[in-house]
Curated annotation (Swiss-Prot):
One GO CC annotation: cytoplasm
Function: Peptide chain release factor 1 directs the termination of translation in response to the peptide chain termination codons UAG and UAA.
Processing after translation: Methylated by PrmC. Methylation increases the termination efficiency of RF1.
Protein name: Peptide chain release factor 1
Keywords: Cytoplasm, Methylation, Protein biosynthesis
Gene name of the record: prfA
Gene Ontology MF term list: translation release factor activity, codon specific
Organism: Dechloromonas aromatica (strain RCB)
InterPro entries: PCRF, Pep_chain_release_fac_I, Pep_chain_release_fac_I_sf, Prokaryotic/Mito_RF, RF-1
N5-methylglutamine modifications at: 235
Amino acid sequence: MKSSIRQKLELLVDRLDEIDRMLSAPSTASDMDQFRKLSRERAEVEPVVVQFNAFRQAENDLAEAEAMLSDPDMREFAEEEMAAAKARLPELELELQKLLLPKDPNDERSVLLEIRAGTGGDESALFAGSLFRMYSRFAERQRWQVEVMSASESELGGYREIICRIAGNGAYSRLKFESGGHRVQRVPETETQGRIHTSACTVAVMPEVDEVEDVNLNPADLRIDTFRASGAGGQHINKTDSAVRITHLPTGIVAECQDGRSQHANKASALKVLAARIKDVQVRAQQAHISSTRKSLIGSGDRSERIRTYNFPQGRITDHRINLTLYKIAAIMDGDMDELLGALAAEHQADLLAELAEQN
C-alpha cells in the first residue's frame, strides 16, 4: 500500500476516535444538528476504518507467519498462513481504495428523465416510447415510482418528447450513465418492404433538486406563459389556459407542463423541471471541464454523443463507451438492465481508481 494512502487511513482512524468522543459529550447530546452531522460522518468513516483494521490484521498475520518459517515444526503451517495472507491483502486493499473514492453528492437523489425523439420521424417517436417503457420497467423492478410530468405523443404512438420523475433512493447512481444519444436499427411497423431503418433519440438524466430554492431562481428572471393544453389529460383542460411554460431569461432554458389537472399543478411541475435543467447545465459544465483533463464515462455533457446502439434484427445492444455488446435485447427492453448498468458502473469505478492512483 502506498504511504500516502496509509496516512489518509490512519488519519481516519484518529478521526473516528474523535467523533466517538464528541458524540458521547453532553454538549453534543443537547445539540441535535451537531449530533446528526457527526452521526452522518461516523456512518461514512466507520466502514473504512473497519476495512483498514482487517487489512492491518492481515499484515500482522503475514509477519507472524514469516517469523515462524525458521521453526521446522511450524514451517508447513507458516507457509499456508503466508499464502492466505498474501491472497487476502490485495483484495482488502482494493476494497479500501473503493471506499476512499469520492462520492457523487447526487447519487442518492431521485431523477428527472427526459427522452426526445430525434432523427427518424415516426419511428424515432416509437423508439422513444420503447425507451420509456424500458426505464419504467427497470424502475418497477427497483420498487421506484414513475410519474409522467410532461408528454407530447406522436400520431402513430410513442412520444416526440416525454419527461418523467423516477423517485427512489439511488436512482441517479444507477441511471446517470444513460444520458446521450441512443440509436435504434429495426424494421418499423409501418415498413412494408422489410427494410431496416435507423433512427435515434436523446436521453437526459438529471438529478432532482430537493427544493426549487436550491437553484437560485430570481422571479424577475422568469417569464411565465399560460396556454390551452392539448392531448392527454382530459377534455376539460382544453377549456382553460391550464398549461404552463416557464422561460429562464438569463439562460434561455424553457420548461413546460400541461399534464396536470390545474394551472397551479402545471406551474409547480414546470418549476421543478426548470430547476433540474438549470442544475443539469451546471453539472454538465463541470463534466466538460473534467473530461478535458481525463476520461469521463459520463461524457463531456454533449447530449448528442452516441452512447448506445439497439440492433433488433441481430438481437443485440452495444454500448460504445465500454465496447460492451449484449445479445439479450428483449430482456433489456423489458427492464432487465442490471448487467448493462453494472458494467458501466464498474468501468466508472475503475476510472476513478486509476485517477486515485495517479494522485497518490
